[in-house]
Swiss-Prot record:
Protein name in the entry: Small ribosomal subunit protein uS13
Function of the protein: Located at the top of the head of the 30S subunit, it contacts several helices of the 16S rRNA. In the 70S ribosome it contacts the 23S rRNA (bridge B1a) and protein L5 of the 50S subunit (bridge B1b), connecting the 2 subunits; these bridges are implicated in subunit movement. Contacts the tRNAs in the A and P-sites.
This protein's record includes keyword Ribosomal protein: yes
Family indicated by similarity: Belongs to the universal ribosomal protein uS13 family.
Keywords: Ribonucleoprotein, Ribosomal protein, RNA-binding, rRNA-binding, tRNA-binding
HAMAP family per record: Ribosomal_uS13
Native source organism of the sequence: Acidiphilium cryptum (strain JF-5)
Database matches in SUPFAM superfamilies: S13-like H2TH domain (SSF46946)
Length: 125
């Protein structure tokens, strides 16, 4: 297993897939990294030389914001919105959807598990 940006990436998978294990690198950035270093996209991590792994490490450290730095930046952006007291900040604070989705029904991922209201009975016919 190669260690890049503090993450153990699987050695039996293709480089293109393995790079996605790093927070902040998705399909497009993984392909961009492979093309800039002229590494075949179908090459597996265990077939890479130590020199190629070092080049990948250096490129990611130099050009991309990943893992802890990116997580910290996202958290700071959310904290800034909350501190401003703007609409998006209020939605974050209340744990509701931020981007205008309906909440009368749905939004269960953001709101959490549904809680039954005590005392409310089903209508009888």
């Amino acid at each position: 297993m190669a260690r890049i940006a503090g993450v153990n990436i699987p050695s039996n998978k293709r480089v293109l897939i393995s790079l996605r294990y790093i927070y902040g690198i998705g399909p497009a950035k993984a392909r961009e990294i492979c093309q800039s270093l002229e590494i075949g996209e179908d090459k597996r991590v265990n077939q890479l030389s130590e020199d190629e792994i070092m080049k990948i490490r250096e490129l990611i450290d130099r050009d991309y914001r990943v893992e802890g730095d990116l997580r910290r930046e996202v958290a700071m952006n959310i904290k800034r919105l909350v501190d401003l007291g703007c609409y998006r900040g209020l939605r974050h604070r209340k744990g509701l959807p931020v981007r205008g989705q309906r909440t009368h029904t749905n939004a269960r991922t953001r709101k959490g598990k549904a809680v039954a209201i005590a005392g409310k009975k089903k209508a009888t016919r």
